[in-house]
């Protein structure tokens, strides 16, 4: 992947932050040896497998996250041993689920936050990893949207999730506010991929009431 740099893998997100052979565990070696030479197939075609080093409690359908065709094997599923059938596309159900104690594999009941450095290494910032908050001022969010879309707000009054996927991640988002001339203005973003590309943040969290800042 990084042949021009003389590397097989880097320690950043594009290679899932490879941390070198000094951090290889016995379980990782065992898993690699047990699956050597094996590939996942679906209808005589190699599967388009995806990986993430973290989870929010539930995965999203592949075609909602990436610009790919629908894959029957990339459906939404629970990130835990507990088969949670909660309908997270419903706004109230999602907010309740988000504030409850998570049973997912990367939640604090499975991995205590004090032990995170063992798994994250020295690359990631210390702090909340499974449930966390990011805040932007009105001006900061206006600049982010302008830089990514060229759409100019003078003020953003509200962010409205119009549709959520099976994981609760927003698939359709409306940004409401005013233009510089004072007229009402709105921006509609109609895919989870586009929302991430524009906002540059994880958007699988509740959009709050506005108190001079937007927090996720």
Regions found by a protein language model. Name each.
Residues 1-216:
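Conserved, single-site charged/polar hotspot
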